[in-house]
């Protein structure tokens, strides 16, 4: 597959993201506008819960209502208070989110507690399922570090009902890597849940070339047809600029950002 071909696919799989403390309505509207490109639209935009309504309005105004709106809960620290995570998830659904990316209580798992993660995901899933909202679970691979813990967090999340497992918040030093992606994709394969569980690489995927490596990895492990927006996403912001440069045939420029 040519770089242009894979860049076009990657664009359609993006959750175009802004999760910054200084986000404003204007910045969210600009993000939505950036997603309307001559090469198509991303799968979703991802914003903080309070910006979900303004994103909905902006997407409708520009005629790209097919773009989903994702948001985050228990973010970014993955605390182990289930009640707070559930309350935040209920609020996210009430704001009108199509998808919720919840942070798994990874520190609790690192301390040996598997149950709290299962219960947190299970209860957030119940909230989402009742409103037909997709639940992605961020396991924070860069903090879990070991293959054993990354696999365990993936397994717990899947068994508790995750629709997607996601690498990272983008708020820690190490975010998505091909190594952690492989473990997560192989877990989806090994548990025989490829038909109902997807994968999201977030943070650290900056270039069309890097995106192509993730697509190739997913195709290798789960098959060519599996890689679509129902099963695969990139959480990114700066990646879009680079994908558009590749699609326009320009030299790739490194860009800063998530």
Swiss-Prot record:
This protein's name: Deoxyribose-phosphate aldolase
Record-stated family: Belongs to the DeoC/FbaB aldolase family. DeoC type 2 subfamily.
Domain of life assignment: Bacteria
CDD domains: DeoC
GO aspect biological process, one term: carbohydrate catabolic process
InterPro entries: Aldolase_TIM (IPR013785), DeoC (IPR011343), DeoC/FbaB/LacD_aldolase (IPR002915), DeoC_typeII (IPR023649)
Transmembrane stretches, start-end: none
One annotated GO molecular function: deoxyribose-phosphate aldolase activity
UniProt pathway annotation: Carbohydrate degradation; 2-deoxy-D-ribose 1-phosphate degradation; D-glyceraldehyde 3-phosphate and acetaldehyde from 2-deoxy-alpha-D-ribose 1-phosphate: step 2/2
Active site: 101 (proton donor/acceptor), 166 (schiff-base intermediate with acetaldehyde), 200 (proton donor/acceptor)
First and last residue of the signal peptide: none
Enzyme class: lyase
Catalysed transformations (reactions): 2-deoxy-D-ribose 5-phosphate = D-glyceraldehyde 3-phosphate + acetaldehyde
Subcellular location: Cytoplasm
Entry keyword set: Cytoplasm, Lyase, Schiff base
Enzyme Commission number(s) of this protein: 4.1.2.4
